[in-house]
Amino acid sequence: MNADAFRHFYNYHFAENRKIWDRYITPLSYEQFTQKVDYSHGSVRDQIVHLIDAEDMWFSELRGANPSDPIPPANSDDREFIRKHWDSVEQKIREYLASLQDDMLFTKPIKEPEEDQVLFVWQVLLHVVNHGTDHRAQLLRELSNLGFKTEYQDYIFYVYENLQGAAK
């Protein structure tokens, strides 16, 4: 386990997030984007906002910083605002990952909340990507219910696609 492996894994995570946004979220009608779903965090919009807020919260804890303000209700339906906010959170994560060193993986930098103080950096890093995979799967199911033909998000296909690109 090393910092480069985590950077690679997060490149997969970011690529899958963008793929879902570009292929499926962008073409949704307002009604589809905000349609109430009786599962998990609700609508497609609410799932996306939850993903953004959770990633921001975890990486803020790792940095010892306060998370960004949540997306205000007045902007919660504004996809352009949400995308810009998500881009900002992703950029902060990329900056953290760029400075990540192997020895940091085995530190416990979180001060609050108390239950998170036992977590090593590597555990938080794995959790965030796993959490993203879980919610993308939920989103893909909901998008399928809305009539979209969705695609896989398996890590191994990301590897294959990037190996092929590197071999050319």
Spell out what each predicted region is:
Residues 7-26, 30-72, 113-168:
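Short, contiguous alpha-helical
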Residues 78-88, 104-105, 121-127, 158-162:
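Short alpha-helical interface patches
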Residues 64-103:
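Helix-adjacent hinge/juxtasegments
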Residues 98-114:
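Acidic catalytic patch
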